[in-house]
Design a protein with these regions (language model features):
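Gram-negative (and chloroplast) outer-membrane scaffold detector with strong preference
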Residues: 62-137, 166, 195-197
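Short, positively charged, low-complexity/disordered linker segments
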Residues: 136-163
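Residues on the lipid-exposed face of transmembrane beta-strands in outer-membrane beta-barrel proteins
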Residues: 39-41, 59-65, 98-104, 120-124, ...
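Short glycine/proline- and aromatic-enriched beta-strand/turn motifs that initiate or cap beta-hairpins
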Residues: 26-76, 194-196
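Extracellular loop and loop/strand-boundary signature of outer-membrane beta-barrel proteins
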Residues: 46-49, 84-91, 138-144, 175-180
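Residues that define the transmembrane beta-barrel architecture of outer-membrane proteins
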Residues: 33-35, 53-59, 92-98, 114, ...
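Predominantly the C-terminal beta-signal and adjacent terminal strand-loop region
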Residues: 80-83, 157-197
Length: 197
């Protein structure tokens, strides 16, 4: 009888423990002053190019800081590389950018597991064109130059809580760059993870 009772107590404790870890505890989500680290990979959307063209990619890391009512600010360091076709040669365009911005919730489910955000940010950085080489392989001179760039970004984001502290993100952004000699508007899509602490 005592052996059966021990087994039932152990089984009940295991079930209670499993339930505690499997049920979301939303009290720990989106707390004001909560911070997070975000890592994303991105793909630039280039008119006339395949969606996942070789050597067209980006990556970024950001720090987030939650304010009240599920909104947050962020600072992001980002690198993006694109190939611009010229005859049989690809001219490399590389951007190293720093963004500072604000995201505001637009829509969420009742359980606060899925959020849609809209936001804006300011950016600045350096754009390198063809590794600063002025001559192309066919002898043509590249008139566009490397520059410091600045501008603004509009963001859209879908964020899903995988656990109370880990989110899966899918983002779209449209960058408006000034100071550049090529493509002032640069859309991109990205996906990644955020770890809140």
């Amino acid at each position: 009888m005592v052996g059966i009772m021990k087994k039932k107590i152990i089984l009940s404790a295991c079930v209670a423990l499993a339930m505690a870890f499997s049920l979301p505890s939303q009290a720990q989500r989106l707390i004001p002053k909560q911070r997070g680290i975000e890592v994303v990979g991105s793909v630039p959307l280039i008119k006339g190019e395949k969606f996942l063209a070789a050597d067209n990619f980006g990556m970024g890391a950001s720090l987030t800081h939650y304010l009240g009512r599920e909104n947050y600010t962020f600072v992001m360091a980002e690198y993006e590389q694109q190939n611009m076709p010229y005859r049989s040669y690809n001219v490399k365009l590389k951007d190293a950018l720093l963004q500072m911005g604000y995201m505001h919730p637009v829509l969420s489910d009742n359980g606060k597991n899925v959020f849609l955000y809209g936001g804006i940010s300011a950016l600045g950085g350096y754009e390198q064109l063809n590794e600063d080489k002025k001559l192309l392989p066919d002898g043509a001179t590249l008139l566009d130059r490397s520059h410091f760039v600045y501008g603004g970004v509009v963001h859209g984001s879908a964020e899903v809580f995988l656990t109370d502290r880990v989110l899966f993100l899918v983002k779209a952004q449209g960058r408006f760059l000034f100071g550049t000699d090529v493509h002032r508007f640069r859309p991109a899509v990205s996906a990644g993870l955020r770890f809140n602490f």
